[in-house]
């Protein structure tokens, strides 16, 4: 099963058009520990039945067939429930949907294939490879026997102290739930891509030459930081619908050396902090740290390059700038705030020419005459066409650049009236240089300015909650002005909101399948009660590891519930059979728990072993898969 299932899964992925990417392969790696569950239960029961009928003279094939039929229903329903819990993940939207839908598809395909193999290939292989025991009895290893003895002592104590057991379980659950407010919430853990993008924003009115000079100095400073391998940068970006940039902006890509070559004890955050310190010497510069892939994804999905973006909407640019400055000051006071960036909308100088209508009237001119002259002198006007073979080029006439950039030269432009009288432009107009907006940003037709801030050493949810509270309490917005919250926070709100709908539906679907299996509300409710206590280990695991309650962690809880239900189905199905055979409740529970201890322990152990590598992995994408592994492993420890 473990060999054929991945191969058949790859074939199915190819037919369904699912690419082999970080998340789909991660889903297959997660499924490695789950795809043998059905086979473990089948082989375990076959071995047990062969021992019982060792001296009966019945053929081995018939005994194995009966053993498979005995566990077929609970195995099919159990693995089917695990597949079911992943199906709602396929409905996730946005960035989280792009990431976790391939994972869910891959796991569902792998488990479906493993289920078919466990019901067909595994029994056949068992007849050839499984040597029947010489007699019925205890065939456990020393380790399993020792574990079983300890478990039975605990089980007998629990059955003899039912009230204490229930109270302890409820208290443990309540105390664990009490830690939830301290976990913090986040969208998706930041992946370490091996490169850094220190986005640099200079004053808007800077010249291209000066911007290039400053960028070269910035790259020289960045290369002095330990752990930096190379730095490549470009200034500005062509006008495009995706992400235009002016000559005052740049997004250099800084490649980092392997971790073994970093200073001892340094992390990527330490390298980024060192870059910030180096770049502080550059005047008038805003620096926002990001990573190449996440930077582009954030820009495309949310329109901003920060963890949190506060969008201020209104009509007056000066008022927008004032409100944004107030929000920026509030954000700076919060613990964990870094890379504050307020969108620069001012800083561009304009030449203002106010025409004196009475003065031009005395010369017999109108406003359009003066405007035409200015358009020709400064902007240029097509005066003729130049032919070069079969090609034609417009010939534009305007003043030389040295005159166009000189206020005095423009003031001395002569205006000739219809009767031949001449006057300087300064005599018929008021000419002045004034500061104006460098850019005017709009969203859905409304003017806006963005305040962006990144969060360090703190969860996103609590930071935004505190910032919203302080902004609401300290800043009063004029009529017609309003705020919108975006960035990664927007993704987190959407994803967690979707999961709040998915999780209850998943639990309801599990309950429905359990009811179909047992045709009993009592047994279905009994197995469903495992879910809260399985969650205890997942929550404790997140709390101890310092991970936040994120989308991957939520996916981990969904996977955990499926595995916990499978183990519960295997155990309760056997106990139910013993009850129908006339055993008392206590005897049925003890015997069922004893005989099903090994398969339940094996399925849980194999699932945990398949996820342990994710705890210690440091490759790209491991940050996303680690919370999922922590939740499943921690939950299996408590629920098993």
Summary of predicted features, one role per range:
Residues 43, 49-77, 148, 496, ...:
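Helix-loop junctions and hydrophobic alpha-helical segments within the transmembrane domains
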Residues 51-65, 95-101, 120-173, 204-210, ...:
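Interfacial helix-loop-helix hairpins and adjacent transmembrane helices
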Residues 43, 57-58, 65, 288, ...:
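Extracytoplasmic/periplasmic membrane-proximal domains and adjacent transmembrane bundles
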Residues 18, 89-99, 170-206, 261-263, ...:
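Transmembrane helices with small-residue packing motifs
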Residues 185-258, 272-277, 313-350, 439:
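Extracytoplasmic/periplasmic
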Residues 1-48, 91, 109, 509-596, ...:
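Hydrophobic transmembrane alpha-helices and their membrane-interface caps
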Residues 209-304, 358-380, 387:
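Solvent-exposed, membrane-proximal periplasmic/extracellular interface segments of envelope transport
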Residues 71, 139-189, 229, 281-286, ...:
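Signature of alpha-helical transmembrane segments and their immediate interfacial
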């Amino acid at each position: 099963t473990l060999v054929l299932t991945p191969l058949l899964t790859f074939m199915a992925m190819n037919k369904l058009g699912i690419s082999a990417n970080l998340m789909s392969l991660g889903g297959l790696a997660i499924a490695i520990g789950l795809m043998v569950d059905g086979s473990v239960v089948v082989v375990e029961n076959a071995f047990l039945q062969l021992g019982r009928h060792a001296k009966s003279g019945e053929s081995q094939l018939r005994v194995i067939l009966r053993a498979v039929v005995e566990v077929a229903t609970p195995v099919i329903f159990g693995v089917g429930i695990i597949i079911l819990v992943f199906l709602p993940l396929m409905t996730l939207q946005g960035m989280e949907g792009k990431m976790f839908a391939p994972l869910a598809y891959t796991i569902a395909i792998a488990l479906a294939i493993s289920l078919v193999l466990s019901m067909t290939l595994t029994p056949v292989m068992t007849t050839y490879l499984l040597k029947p025991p010489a007699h019925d009895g205890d065939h456990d290893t020393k380790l399993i026997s020792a574990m079983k003895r300890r478990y039975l002592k605990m089980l007998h104590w629990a059955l003899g102290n039912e009230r204490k057991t229930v109270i302890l379980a409820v208290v443990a659950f309540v105390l664990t739930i009490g830690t939830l407010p301290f976990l913090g919430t986040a969208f998706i853990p930041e992946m370490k891509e091996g490169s850094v993008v220190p986005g640099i924003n200079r004053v808007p009115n800077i010249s291209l030459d000066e911007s290039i000079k400053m960028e070269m100095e910035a790259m020289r400073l960045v290369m002095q930081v330990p752990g930096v391998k190379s730095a490549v940068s470009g200034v500005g970006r062509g006008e495009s619908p995706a992400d235009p940039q002016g000559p005052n902006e740049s997004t250099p890509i800084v490649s980092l050396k392997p971790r073994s070559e970093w200073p001892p004890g340094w992390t990527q955050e330490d390298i980024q902090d060192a870059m910030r310190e180096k770049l502080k010497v550059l005047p008038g510069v805003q620096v926002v740290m990001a990573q190449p892939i996440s930077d582009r994804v954030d820009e495309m999905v949310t329109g901003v390059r920060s963890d949190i973006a506060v969008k201020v909407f209104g009509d007056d640019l000066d008022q927008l700038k004032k409100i944004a400055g107030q929000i920026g000051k509030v954000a700076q006071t919060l613990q964990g705030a870094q890379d504050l960036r307020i969108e620069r909308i001012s800083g561009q100088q304009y030449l203002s020419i106010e025409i004196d209508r009475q003065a031009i009237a005395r010369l017999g001119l109108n406003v359009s005459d003066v405007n035409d002259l200015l358009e020709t002198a400064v902007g240029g006007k097509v005066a003729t066409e130049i032919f070069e073979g079969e090609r034609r080029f417009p010939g534009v006439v305007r003043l030389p650049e040295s005159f166009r950039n000189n206020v005095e030269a423009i003031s001395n432009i002569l205006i000739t009236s219809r009767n031949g009288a001449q006057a300087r432009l300064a005599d018929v107009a008021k000419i002045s240089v004034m500061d104006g907006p460098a850019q005017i940003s709009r969203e859905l037709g409304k003017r806006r300015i963005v305040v962006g801030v990144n969060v360090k050493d703190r969860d996103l949810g609590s930071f935004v909650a505190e910032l919203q509270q302080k902004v609401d309490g300290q800043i009063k917005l004029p009529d017609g002005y309003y705020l919108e919250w975006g960035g990664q926070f927007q993704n987190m709100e959407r994803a967690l909101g979707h999961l709040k709908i998915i999780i209850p539906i998943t639990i309801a679907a599990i309950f429905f399948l359990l009811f179909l299996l047992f045709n009993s509300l009592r047994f279905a409710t009994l197995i469903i009660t495992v879910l809260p206590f399985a969650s205890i280990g997942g929550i404790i695991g997140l709390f101890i590891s310092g991970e936040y309650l994120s989308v991957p962690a939520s996916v981990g809880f969904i996977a955990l519930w499926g595995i916990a239900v499978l183990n519960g189905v295997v155990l309760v199905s056997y106990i139910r059979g013993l009850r129908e055979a006339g055993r008392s409740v206590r005897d049925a529970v003890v015997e069922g728990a004893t005989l099903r201890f090994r398969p339940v322990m094996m399925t849980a152990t194999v699932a945990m072993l398949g996820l342990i590598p994710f705890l210690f992995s440091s490759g790209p994408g491991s940050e996303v898969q680690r919370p999922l592994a922590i939740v499943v492993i921690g939950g299996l420890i408590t629920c098993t």
